[in-house]
Regions:
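Compositionally biased, charged N-terminal/linker segments
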Residues: 1-62
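Boundary/linker segments flanking structured domains
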Residues: 9, 158-163, 170, 190-192
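Short, cationic low-complexity segments
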Residues: 32-37, 137-146
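Structured alpha/beta reader/binder surfaces that contact nucleic acids or chromatin modification marks
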Residues: 37-110
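Alpha-helix boundary/N-cap detector
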Residues: 57-61, 144, 165-169, 173, ...
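Aromatic- and Lys/Arg-enriched surface recognition patch
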Residues: 83-84, 90-143
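Long, charge-rich alpha-helical interaction segments
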Residues: 140-165
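Amphipathic alpha-helical protein-protein interaction segments
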Residues: 172-202
């Protein structure tokens, strides 16, 4: 599903190395694949060929999504590899290439986008998120589209403009947002919200 504003899981693990701290410090999300070239003007076929020439055939989907489908103003949900913390951000730029990170065998991350991290770069707890979102976070790939959860996630990130902080339990926030979803225009979301309210006696 690709619409006007998408929500993406982006894992901070280029070449299997946890770069969550670097992502936060440098205000970025990024992927690896140091080929010595920017992917900006590559067609999908060109991208597939250059990755294959370096033995990264399985990385095509990740690179293609990152370069061609993520967009400025999309929401990113970035789960730290500690399986506890979740960070929220807004993509702030188009794709760009960092030559100084394009070093073979260093497990770096040359293909980047700038991100505005929300909530002063403080994490939410994975355990406080609704079951449906936690289920999506179990997807093992580097990048996944979870726009089906956009309404709920936008309600969370809108807290950035209130006095609410991450010290407030997301469980209590989830109750408020869930009740708001009872009036959603989307019938499937509305029915699911009713089921959850009844299940948890909210």
């Amino acid at each position: 599903m690709i619409i006007d504003r998408n929500v993406w899981i982006v894992r901070p693990l280029p070449h299997g190395v946890n770069r969550m701290n670097e992502f936060l410090d440098e205000d970025i999300i990024a992927i690896g694949f140091p080929t010595g070239k920017s992917f900006e003007n590559f067609s999908s076929d060109d991208l597939k060929k250059i990755l294959a020439s370096h033995g990264w055939d399985e990385g095509f989907k990740t690179a293609n999504l990152f370069v061609k489908y993520l967009n400025k103003n999309d929401i990113v949900v970035v789960p730290d590899n500690n399986k506890r913390d979740i960070y929220f951000g807004i993509i702030d730029t188009k794709y760009f290439h960092k030559p100084d990170k394009d070093v073979p065998y260093e497990n770096l991350y040359p293909h980047q986008r700038k991100v505005k991290w929300l909530f002063d770069k403080k994490p939410f707890l994975r355990s406080d998120l609704p079951d449906e979102i936690r289920g999506s976070l179990r997807y093992p790939g580097t990048i996944a589209n979870i726009t089906k959860h956009r309404e709920f996630i936008e309600n969370i990130i809108n807290l950035e403009n209130t006095n609410t902080t991450t010290e407030t339990s997301l469980k209590s926030l989830a109750v408020t947002q869930l009740k708001d979803l009872l009036t959603s225009q989307n019938e499937e979301i509305r029915i699911r919200a009713i089921e959850l309210v009844m299940k948890h006696n909210l």
